[in-house]
Amino acid sequence: MKSRKVSIIVAIFNVEKYLVKCIESIISQDYKNLEIILVDDNSTDKSSDICEKYAQKDSRIKVFHHKKNTRQAGVRNTGLKHSTGDYIVFVDGDDWLAADCISYLIKIIELTDSDMAINLVNFTTRDLKQLKHDGKIEVWTPEKALAEFVYPHLAVGVWNKIYRRELIEKNNIRFVEGLFTAEGDRFVFDVIQKSSKVGVGCRKVYYYRLNNTQSATTKYDVRQSQGAIEVVNKQKEDLIIKTPMVLNAINQHIWLNYFWNIRQIIALGKQDKLKDSYQYSISYVKKNYRAVVKDEKRRTKKIKYFLSGKFPVIMARLKNMQMNFKLKIDLMRFRSERND
């Protein structure tokens, strides 16, 4: 039986420093039936040249150049437009894949006969040891998958997942352009609601880079948190699966985004400039934390949410300090390993 073709759509914008590692990790996959779609979003560095160089080396690579910057949603829609594979995988141009990432995702989605499959993700600056076995693979209902994604108990974003292209095309699912952030969350949200079931693996085979200073994960920008609040509220309006489990999850996600907004504003020192947003977010977190704590099953999270609801400003500052400390430690380990 011929293997299924996988279209890997890579979103690229000013990532020349990291792009070679990203592309090398894709072309070196142990699963070979790939269509590699590199979409450059009008980069001003050498990203475009790197793409063309690799296209000359590997016939599986197709390169598309945007004449103006359209952000992640526009880039990924271009990739979808030109994809022909049975499955779709999205990769950010500054991230990279474990050598068997695609074969592992294929195993999950085909073994479970699902419409999409999810694996775990490493948020890191360096390669980490992989498990020697594939571990447990689960099948989730759309309700459970949506709740776990929205809470979020899983990494939000379109990467670290594989999608059945037929489902995407049949339901005309595309990225919503014009959003500043969370366009990937919205896409996954739409796919899950149209899926019959979702396969879930336990291995971390997608590496999300932490040391890109322009990444949403490492760069403070209040537009990220405020945009996320807008997107999640819109998702709540558009819910098809309106069970208590999903509604509790989405309410918690909204609450977490308001807490994130407090963190962003504090990190940027804009408490006075963004006073209305800052004060409203504090009020929202204080007013609604009890329901979030009651719904949360994990003890450590219960404690964190309780403290965040009672002392949102203090906890936001501590969370920012923790995030910065973790990044510094990871970078120190990366530099140490590189010098060995």
Language-model region placement:
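Glycine-rich, basic loop-to-helix element that forms the pyrophosphate-binding segment
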Residues: H66-S83, F90
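Donor-binding/catalytic cores of nucleotide-activated saccharide
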Residues: Q72, G93-G201, Y206-R223
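Acidic helix N-cap motif at the loop->helix transition within catalytic regions
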Residues: V20, D45-Y54, W96, D100-I102
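Membrane-interface aromatic/basic loop that binds lipid-linked glycans or pyrophosphate carriers
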Residues: L268-D340
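N-proximal low-complexity "stem/linker" segments adjacent to membrane-targeting elements
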Residues: M1-I27
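Conserved short acidic donor-positioning loop in nucleotide-sugar-dependent glycosyltransferases
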Residues: I26, D41-N42, T70, G93
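A conserved acidic beta->alpha catalytic loop
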Residues: D40-D49, K68
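Catalytic core of nucleotide-sugar-dependent glycosyltransferases
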Residues: S196, R203-N212, T218-M245, W260, ...
